[in-house]
Amino acid sequence: MKSLKAYAQAAHFGPTMLITAISFLLASRLWWEGPAYVIAFTVFLGQLLIGWSNDVYDYQDDLKHNRVNKPLVSGQLKIEKLRRATFILLPFAVIANLLGPLGLKGGAVYLLGVGCGIAYNFYFKFRITSPLVYFIALAALPASIFYAVDRNPPLWVLATSSLLGVAFHFANVLKDLSADRDSKIGGLPQRVGKRTSLIIIAILLIIVITILLNSPISSTFTSDFI
């Protein structure tokens, strides 16, 4: 049981379950609960890949900063085991998403988002273009579910998802700004600092709210299968 909890912590359980829950709600609205459960599971597998690869890559830096809330640092989980689990999971996650209810097109789009998350872990978090992968990945999630039901995702859905993704990126980094700079992590939030990041978050949220208030939400998220 402790081992299972450690794997869950290494997957960044909160964000992972949030994305999984969103995928279930979207799939339930656009399709029905049967495939929605399967879609949520396949999405969950993709989020595990992102979270686990992040903790594997960050292991040395987490040790340096004594982040004992991380299971690899606290000793609850060995890095060899987490690395092995990540590589074992990879083909299953790819196959499940491509051959599951998302279909080839929807599955490929979602896996693009997963790829963006992994690319952030290994490359983009050091670059000024760090928000780009969040912009793409958070749009890929709803887009994949729309494609699964043979519908094109509305532009306003993609826009709000992307902007929320970027806002989350800036918000998520705030608590670790000093440690990140010490570790030479130079994404855009680390470069502009806390005050500017907060301003950017506020602007993005205002734009998102404005778009939502002027969008046909109820008619968009209606299933054709009922």
Residue ranges and their predicted role:
Residues M1-I226:
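Multi-pass alpha-helical membrane architecture of UbiA-family
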